[in-house]
């Protein structure tokens, strides 16, 4: 019996740590009583061995063994590269 790991698609929010990125995944939920839909962003710490993902990239992550206290995901592939707009200093 083959065990298939969970995969998610999200965008990179932060890449300031060494070999770690923060990925945001938007989840749309419906309130059980009022039936209103609302959006939540779930944040995951993801292991990026080669430091290849940058802010704004759309990536696929896959579940893996625990790498640290909060890292249970690793980078599978980069789907699209993001465009970073640098803020101009006045």
Curated annotation (Swiss-Prot):
Q: GO CC terms on record? A: cytosolic small ribosomal subunit
Q: Which cysteines are joined by disulfide bonds?
A: none
Q: Which domain of life is it from?
A: Bacteria
Q: Give the matching SUPFAM superfamilies.
A: Nucleic acid-binding proteins (SSF50249)
| UniProt-listed PROSITE patterns | RIBOSOMAL_S17
| Gene Ontology biological-process annotations | translation
Which Pfam families does its entry note?
A: Ribosomal_S17 (PF00366)
Q: Which UniProt keywords apply?
A: Ribonucleoprotein, Ribosomal protein, RNA-binding, rRNA-binding
Please name the GO terms that the record assigns under molecular function.
rRNA binding; structural constituent of ribosome
Which InterPro entries does this UniProt record tie to the protein? NA-bd_OB-fold (IPR012340), Ribosomal_uS17 (IPR000266), Ribosomal_uS17_bact/chlr (IPR019984), Ribosomal_uS17_CS (IPR019979)
User: Subunit composition?
Assistant: Part of the 30S ribosomal subunit.
Q: Check the record and name the NCBIfam families matching this protein.
A: PRK05610.1, uS17_bact
Name the family.
Belongs to the universal ribosomal protein uS17 family.
- Function, in words: One of the primary rRNA binding proteins, it binds specifically to the 5'-end of 16S ribosomal RNA.
- The name on file for this protein is Small ribosomal subunit protein uS17
Protein species of origin: Dehalococcoides mccartyi (strain ATCC BAA-2100 / JCM 16839 / KCTC 5957 / BAV1)
Organism ancestry: Bacteria, Bacillati, Chloroflexota, Dehalococcoidia, Dehalococcoidales
List the gene name. Answer: rpsQ
């Amino acid at each position: 019996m083959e065990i298939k790991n969970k995969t998610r698609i999200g965008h990179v929010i932060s890449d300031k740590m060494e070999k770690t990125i923060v990925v945001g995944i938007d989840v749309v939920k419906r309130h059980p009583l009022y039936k209103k839909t609302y959006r939540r962003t779930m944040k995951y710490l993801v292991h990026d061995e080669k430091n290849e993902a940058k802010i704004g990239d759309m990536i696929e992550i896959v579940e893996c063994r625990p790498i640290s206290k909060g890292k249970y995901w690793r980078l599978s592939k980069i789907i699209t590269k993001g465009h970073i707009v640098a803020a101009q200093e006045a």
